[in-house]
Amino acid sequence: MIKKKNLLIFFAGFIFLISNFTFAQQNFLYKSNNQNTEQNNIANSILNRIGAGLSSGNVSEISGYLNTQTYLSLANGISGYYSSNQAFYVLEDFFNIYKVTSFHFQSVQTNGNLPYATGVYKYYFRGKKDSANVYISLKEVGDTWKITQITIN
């Protein structure tokens, strides 16, 4: 009789522990998903602001998001890693030569650790209309997102 009682107490305690553990996991996953959703929303907002900067050809709207080392690959043949200051002037020269007529993102991916967007940059160059594909990737730096790569080819 005592063995059955001890066994019953053991199983009741075991079930209690498992249910608490499961609740803790669900609570952790809920918090984690909310944080991911918030980070995705922030990344999406930043990509929209970068898109607005590309649409206007205004590098000042983009410069606050340039990482300490940003990879650039541009239609004028420039490619490599640049500091945020260097990237500002390289992009400013590019926008002055390749005058934007329109820009829009075709795809924005903010799920995961490395958000990115692709789009089409339409411009005038030497009196002719042309277009280039755009790829922009971000990475989380501290409590914000920074541009790690801009490709306009």
Question: Model segments located where?
Answer:
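Surface-exposed, charged secondary-structure patches
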Residues: 88-126
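A short gly/proline-enriched turn/hairpin at secondary-structure junctions
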Residues: 72-80
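Envelope-exposed proteins and targeting segments
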Residues: 50, 68, 99-104, 115-119, ...
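Sec-exported extracytoplasmic/periplasmic mature domains
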Residues: 51-55, 59, 67, 71, ...
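Bacterial Sec-dependent N-terminal signal peptides
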Residues: 1-29
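Hydrophobic pocket/interface hotspot
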Residues: 62, 70, 87
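Short beta-strand edge/turn micro-motifs at domain boundaries
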Residues: 25-27, 129-153
